[in-house]
From Swiss-Prot:
Quaternary structure note: Component of the mitochondrial ribosome large subunit (39S) which comprises a 16S rRNA and about 50 distinct proteins.
Location in the cell: Mitochondrion
GO molecular-function terms, A-Z: structural constituent of ribosome
Taxonomic superkingdom: Eukaryota
Gene Ontology CC, one term: mitochondrion
Main localization of the protein described in the UniProt heading: mitochondrion
A biological process term (GO) from this entry: mitochondrial translation
Name under which the protein is recorded: Large ribosomal subunit protein bL33m
Alphabetical UniProt keywords: Mitochondrion, Ribonucleoprotein, Ribosomal protein, Transit peptide
Protein's organism: Drosophila melanogaster
Length: 64
C-alpha cells in the first residue's frame, strides 16, 4: 500500500437529496439542497388539494 492512498480522504458531496412532504396532504417529492444549508421549507403546488401548500423537509435520502 502506498502512502498516497492512506493520505486521501473520502470526499463528501456538496449537495444531498431530501424528501419534502406537504404539511396539508402528505404529498411527497424529492429535492436537492446544499449539505451545509438549513432544512428546506418551500411553498409549492400540491396536486392532491389543487392549491399551493407548505412543504417541509422530512428526511435525507442520499448524497448527490
Amino acid at each position: 500500500m502506498r502512502l498516497t492512498n492512506v493520505l486521501f480522504k473520502k470526499v463528501k458531496s456538496k449537495r444531498i437529496m431530501v424528501v419534502l412532504e406537504s404539511v396539508v396532504s402528505g404529498h411527497q417529492f424529492n429535492a436537492f439542497r446544499d449539505r451545509l444549508a438549513d432544512k428546506l421549507e418551500i411553498i409549492r403546488f400540491d396536486p392532491y388539494i389543487q392549491q399551493e401548500s407548505l412543504y417541509r423537509e422530512r428526511k435525507k435520502i442520499r448524497s448527490a
